Structures are given as C-alpha cells and as structure tokens.
From Swiss-Prot:
Signal peptide extent: none
Annotated organism of origin: Anopheles gambiae
Family: Belongs to the eukaryotic ribosomal protein eS1 family.
InterPro entries from the UniProt entry: Ribosomal_eS1, Ribosomal_eS1_CS, Ribosomal_eS1_euk
Organism taxonomic ancestry: Eukaryota, Metazoa, Ecdysozoa, Arthropoda, Hexapoda
Name of protein: Small ribosomal subunit protein eS1
One Pfam entry name: Ribosomal_S3Ae
UniProt gene name: RpS3A
This protein's UniProt keywords: Cytoplasm, Ribonucleoprotein, Ribosomal protein
Length: 269
C-alpha cells in the first residue's frame, strides 16, 4: 500500500460530491403546438424547450421540430379509417406560447401496411415527384392490390405485366393531375378523405379490379421561401386581429373624455 496522505478522504470524499443537484425542468417552458386550420383539432399537444438565456433564444430551439400525430386525433374522430394514417407537422414559427406548424408529410402505420399484404394477389405501387402551385415539391407514394372478380372461379388474382404497367401509368397521371392543380392546403384537404386514392381505384377498374388503394406516403422534398403571412392564414390569423389593430392605429380613434379631464402626472418618463 502506498504511504502518504489520501487527499480525497481528508477533504471528505470525492471532488464535487457536494454539488447541488438542479432539476433540469426548472429551466424549461411548455409551449402549445397548434395545427393548421385544415384540421378540426387545432390543439395538438405541448412541447418543452429551454428558456431564453443569453444568445440562446427559445424560439430558435422550437423551429424545425417535427410532430407526428394520428389523423384520428387531428380530426377528433377515433374511427378505424383514420387511426392508421399519421400526419407530420413541422414547427415554422412561434407566436407567444403557441408553436405554429405546417404540413410536413403523411404515412400509413406499419401494422396497416403489413396487414394488407396477402397471398394470391398482385401488389402494385408507384411514386411520383410533383410540384404544387405554391412551390412545394412533394414525393407521393401510392399502393394498391388486385382483387378477384366476382365472376372468376380461380383462386388467384394475379395481374399481367402489361396490366400492371397500365395501372401504374393511371396512378401517376391521376396523382399529377390532382396535385399540380392546387396548393399545399388543397393537397392536405384531398389527403384527409383520401379522395385521390378513391379516384385511382375507380379509374383502374376497367384494367383490373383493385382494392386497398391508398396514398401510402407523402414526403416534402423542397419548400419555397418562408412567408409568415401565408402561415398566419393557415392558422386563421391572416387579416384578423393584427390587421384590425394596425388599421385602427393608422386611422385613429375618437375617445370620449369627461369635461375638465386632465391626464395623470407620471412619476418618470
């Protein structure tokens, strides 16, 4: 054993053992996450962020966060048709204690996708890159499965290669037609009832009967330059209170005062 003083014991233990433990949550604040006005439930949830300290601003830590929410929660309708679709919302601006979000993507849950794949049928899928009228570049994935005709006696319902190519071409054409003619808000409104997939299923019946046709995933590849006014319109604030306040301040308002009114004397200026 080494001879000499044990500095750690003489000082009462290891260095830093008496340091006070600070709860990290005391330095954080809660913010409300707000969904755009395309959805019925605007209050998505809450998120934590460190308070503004020095050069670290709290709003900068919130911007860019992605929240994944089930469509059933966004629409306040917990039915089976909505629960397996997940929407991604990205934080783009902070207004007071509200985090204003915008659409960032959509996908089906894994269990729904796995449950649709079965034997004795053909899986047909396609992906298309399309641009909306307001400059968003989206990659849209579509999936569908062949189904046995009611008059058929066969066990299987496999489509021929030429039929698969024809169906895939129809999928691509319908997706391009529906998305290139509208803005991002219109795309989301079409994704909510999945009207694009229903149009594809109806159009492909002449080639081969399909079922379980869905827009499987939507990715946002590119965005236009951030515009606060368009984001406020999505959240129902465009031309609202802020516009009224600015208009009133510019035009001036006549205020009734009692006779002999004198303004109060201020202690400091």
């Amino acid at each position: 054993m080494a001879v000499g003083k044990n500095k750690g014991v003489s000082k009462g233990g290891k260095k830093g053992s008496k340091k006070k433990v600070v709860d990290p949550f005391t330095r954080k604040d809660w913010y409300d996450v707000k969904a755009p006005n395309m959805f019925k439930n605007r209050q998505v949830g809450k998120t934590l962020v460190n308070r503004t300290q020095g050069t670290k601003i709290a709003s900068d830590g919130l911007k860019g966060r992605v929240f994944e929410v089930s469509l059933a929660d966004l629409q306040n309708e917990p039915d089976a048709e909505r629960s397996f679709r997940k929407f991604k919302l990205v934080a783009e601006s902070v207004n007071g204690r509200d985090v204003l979000t915008n659409f960032h993507g959509m996908a089906l849950t894994t269990d729904k996708l796995r449950s649709m794949v079965k034997k004795w049928q053909t899986l047909i899928e396609c992906s298309v890159d399309v641009k909306t009228t307001d400059g968003f570049m989206l990659r849209v994935f579509c999936i569908g499965f062949t189904i046995k005709d009611s008059m058929s006696q066969r066990k299987t319902c496999y489509a021929q290669h030429s039929q698969i190519k024809n169906i895939r071409a129809k999928m691509t054409a319908i997706i391009k037609r529906e998305i290139t003619s509208t803005d991002l808000k219109g795309v989301v409104e079409k994704l909510l009832p999945d009207s694009i997939a229903k149009d594809i299923e109806k159009a492909c019946q002449v080639v081969y009967p399909l079922h379980d046709v869905y827009i499987r995933k939507v990715k946002v590849l590119k965005k236009p330059r951030f515009d606060l006014s368009s984001l406020m319109e999505l959240h129902g604030d465009g031309g609202g209170k802020a516009a009224e306040v600015s208009t009133g301040a510019a035009s001036g308002v006549v205020v009734d005062r009692p006779e002999g009114y004198e303004p109060p004397v201020q202690a400091s200026v």
